Each structure stands twice: as C-alpha cells, then as structure tokens.
Amino acid sequence: STHKKTLDAINRYNDWPYIQKSIRPIIQAGHTHVHMDLIVGLPHEDFNRFGQSFNDLFSLQPHALQIGFLKLLKGSGVRRMREYKYVADPLAPYEILSTHVLPYDDVRFLKYFEDVFERFYNSERFRTTFGYIGQQLIHGETDAFTYFCDMTRAWLKEGNHKVNLKDIDQI
C-alpha cells in the first residue's frame, strides 16, 4: 500500500517519494526484473484507495505487479485486529472475504481483476502493447486502475472468466 493510514495500522514505514526515486531508474535501466506486490484487504484500504495504491505502483511500470489477498494466518497481528471486522475463509490459506471498508462484492471483483491483470499485464505476452498503453494511462485521462477495472467488467460480461485456461488464446 501507499496509504499512510494503512501502513501505520500495520506498523510499516514507507517513504513513497524515496521508493519512487530509487526504483524508477532500476526499472528504466532494464537490467533487473522488478516485481512489486500489492495486497487487497489491508486496514483502511477500500476499493478506491486500493485503486490509488495500484496506480501509484503501476506508474513505475514494474515488470510484474502481483496482486495478492490478505491472509489471516493464525497468530498474526492483523488477525487479532478486531476493529477491521475481517471475515476470512475458515480454511487455509485464510484469505479475507471482506473488511470494515471492503465488502465481499468488491473483494470478489478484485479477484477477477487480479486474474485479468495477471493474464494481460504480468504474462508479458503483451509487453509492447502495455508499454504503450501504460504510458497513456500514466499520462492520460484514464488511470490504470480504471482501465483494468473496465477490462475486467468486459471480461466478465463476455463470460471469459468461464473459459478453460488452455482455450484462453482463442479469446
């Protein structure tokens, strides 16, 4: 997350301007594969705030931007934080299903979002295309999160989430 209130709640320090300044030249040099992670379900991060963190990380154009889902592992500090009203799958890996600011329907949509983003951006199969689109999203009127949300909605509308993985190239 790049949200200070979220980071404070989980006792993490993040100097975002310093991170940007440090990571951007590494990515631009092209000699090192940069993989960044973003977690769904952290405290105080609703759908829109998650989108802002996504846009912040996407603006760096990492080689991979992995979207994960908070897991409430037994004994973890975040599992004991009752004020965030976590609802999690009772079976391992104990992924969150909803939080105090992120309802189930948003978590479910973000699962589909993650799948679409993984297939199209992280797969690197469309690296040239998304290199161009990425620049438009960073500097244009539509932000990356909105673009990939729209792409996810279209994906769902067309029923592509039901397509067998081996048949995905036919879409």
What kind of feature is each model-predicted range?
Residues K4, L110, L165-I168:
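Intrinsically disordered, low-complexity regions
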